[in-house]
């Protein structure tokens, strides 16, 4: 019986590590996609605004929703396991808080994109409504988000004429429902979740490292000043000696 219990415990720890690694990988991918979506959203209404930009926003938005849905299911299943140890549950709760915060930021960006799209509708002639903002091609930004996982999309833009505001409304509602469903299925109180590291320790380590750098720079500067001063004194002494020798020879 003891050997059996040890074997079951080992299998449980292996499964937890696997789920944890999958969740961390999915979180990293979601962070990249949400960051790319925010970067693309900043160009709406500017000189880089185009039908292709709106389509890249749509595809990046779909990718973020797929990653969020996959990660939500994994975290929900893992946190509802009653056999989890206290330490394992705390680690999953930290991932849960990180995931929900990222999802809320994505929801806010989607609302901003919707409002900007309504305020600055794209014309059928593909001309920017406002001649300001950043310039350049945005396809490289979106490609970093779309290459996170191997999911095939059509290269042809789906919205040639105008942005489908109804589709964005449905996607915003879908993300909103996902956040509500997360809070209903798993009761994780954010204010009870503790971080792995303390902010004071990070600030202290940063301050210590910066202090060491400043001290080393001051020491090097002081050494340079001392060497320069010694050289000047040596030259003055040599000049004085030469003048004395010259006067002595003349007299």
Swiss-Prot record:
Keyword entries, A-Z: Coiled coil, Membrane, Signal transduction inhibitor, Transmembrane, Transmembrane helix
Record-level GO cellular component terms: membrane; neuron projection
UniProt gene name: rgs9bp-b
Membrane-protein topology: Single-pass type IV membrane protein
TM regions (residue ranges): 231-250
The protein's role, per its UniProt record: Regulator of G protein-coupled receptor (GPCR) signaling. Probably acts by regulating the activity of some 'R7' family protein (RGS6, RGS7, RGS9 and/or RGS11).
Positions in the Extracellular compartment: 251
Highest classification ranks of the organism: Eukaryota, Metazoa, Chordata, Craniata, Vertebrata
Protein's name in the database: Regulator of G-protein signaling 9-binding protein B
Similarity annotation: Belongs to the RGS7BP/RGS9BP family.
Domain of life: Eukaryota
Regions of this protein lying in the Cytoplasmic compartment: 1-230
InterPro entries on file: RGS7BP/RGS9BP (IPR026512)
Coiled coil stretches, renumbered: 52-94, 158-187
Signal peptide span: none
Location(s) in or outside the cell: Membrane
BP-aspect Gene Ontology terms: G protein-coupled receptor signaling pathway; negative regulation of signal transduction
